[in-house]
Amino acid sequence: MNKWDERFINLAEFIGEWSSCYQDGRHVGAVIVKDKRVLATGYNGAPSGVVSCKERGECLRKKLNIPSGTRQETCYAVHAEQNAICQAAKMGFCVDGATIYVTHQPCTICTKMIINAGIKKVVYKHGYPDEFSLVLLKDAGVELVKYE
């Protein structure tokens, strides 16, 4: 790892603090970078105009007893990686060939978006219990690096 990796993973952690997720430890940040330039950032939170779990004062998933890593569609939040990719698209930035720095290993759904967006490298700090996402990244030739 070099000083740029450290800067961008630290930025992802800072962005993750903006998360509107109700649960502690679920604050995730993402930064998409190309040629040492930040293209877009994202954090996990409710879509624009939708009241977040933090504002509601409860976690929908916890209320419905949904285990972590399952039924991800039953959540108000959009994942950090998804938000970053959407922001890049909204602003007209091409992420093909870019690197995404994420506080946590991407889930399978985010992994599919990362692959289809053309992102070629994923740098993450914390693991996530989703082995299939690792298989997909390997199959697609996306470099995966755990920041130590």
Annotate each language-model stretch with its function.
Residues 1-148:
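Zinc-dependent deaminase catalytic domain
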